[in-house]
């Protein structure tokens, strides 16, 4: 079964890169993702504030910031309490210049950090990590994280935003 072979390779290597794979558009990509039988992840529930457009219930654009905005290496959806078990990336429109999707295995990075700066790793394990995310009160499509807190939280006012955030702890 090809699906099981791919999932085994994914587990072993952390990522699979398909080059020249015959995907002809986002609908075809959606069908490809569906064959894996994974639980669908609704982006709307993620609390990510990147501006993305929904193509299908499984496919969203990566980020609608202009090409001049640098988006640095980051853990996808790390700042959110709800996240998918797997991520699939597909390039529908290649940029005219530059354009990269760097991948980094967190387990490998952690192992290297433990070898180079173990005191830092121990400090993080002891103290934990806290994310602060300041969101605008209006949409800003010129930013890599330009969804407003209204849109990100799916609310219409501050009171409902506070209620929603309080349910998350």
Where are these regions (language model features)?
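Non-heme Fe(II) oxygenase catalytic core, chiefly the N-lobe of the double-stranded beta-helix
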Residues: 1-169
